Amino acid sequence: MMHFQLAGSGVMSAFYPHESELSRRVKQLIRAAKKQLEALCAMK
């Protein structure tokens, strides 16, 4: 079952490379936003 999931994700990234790139950027943005929020909370 795990092998099928891994192969499926590999096929998805092969067909939609820009999609994985986009999701990675979104995750980076979310991480940056969380850091900024934490910094603001620490400043108070």
Swiss-Prot record:
Protein name from the UniProt record: Regulatory protein CIII
Signal peptide per UniProt: none
Job of this protein: Presence of the CIII protein in the cell results in the stabilization of the CII transcriptional activator (a very unstable protein), CII activates CI, the gene for repressor, and thus promotes the establishment of lysogeny.
Listed InterPro entries: CIII_regul, Phage_lambda_CIII
Lineage, broadest ranks: Viruses, Duplodnaviria, Heunggongvirae, Uroviricota, Caudoviricetes
UniProtKB keywords: Activator, Transcription, Transcription regulation
Stated family: Belongs to the lambda phage CIII protein family.
PROSITE patterns reported for this sequence: LAMBDA_PHAGE_CIII (PS00553)
